[in-house]
Amino acid sequence: PLPPPEKIEDLKKELDTYIGLGEVKREVNNLINMATVFKRREEMGLPNADFSLHMVFTGNPGTGKTMIARLMARIYRSLGILSKGQLVEVDRSGLVAGYVGQTAIKTSKVIEKALGGVLFIDEAYALNGKGDNDFGQEAIDTLLKAMEDHRDDLVVIVAGYDGLMEKFIHSNPGLESRFNRYLHFDDYSLDEMLEIF
């Protein structure tokens, strides 16, 4: 059996202890407030605006993206939005296979593991392959369908460098319509680096 969900106050305190990430912390707190209102309205049977929980994390490697993705999974579980709150982390090689039809199967298996939690795809722009023999598009199509079919119990966070991520999202209307929440992770300052290490 799953351990009971953590208290949202405890998770907010944990977020506060992270070094740097000023803008990210503000955004996460906003998101917690919005998600709380969304959940309350849902419980009261009131109509809700369409509220997408999927996110794009942009920034250089080593800026805290995976750490925040893991925390988001726990936050969404705490708020009753996700049933399990686990994080499944993959990159292109975890989704794409070498032959026609295999990529959809491989991607579906990963999605199955992520149901109830967050699927975190690092360097997601690498799915935008070049040439006819690339199966990245098959992975994207499978992912988009799963985001629709499991909209109540799956959150997808895609991450990578700034410009490349924006290009990736805008390359596909399906991605564009589902990912409209961006969180930018700045590089740590010298002082912050000293605090971390």
Name these PLM-found stretches.
Residues S83-A114, Q137:
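Short glycine-rich substrate-engagement loop in P-loop NTPases that contacts/grips substrate
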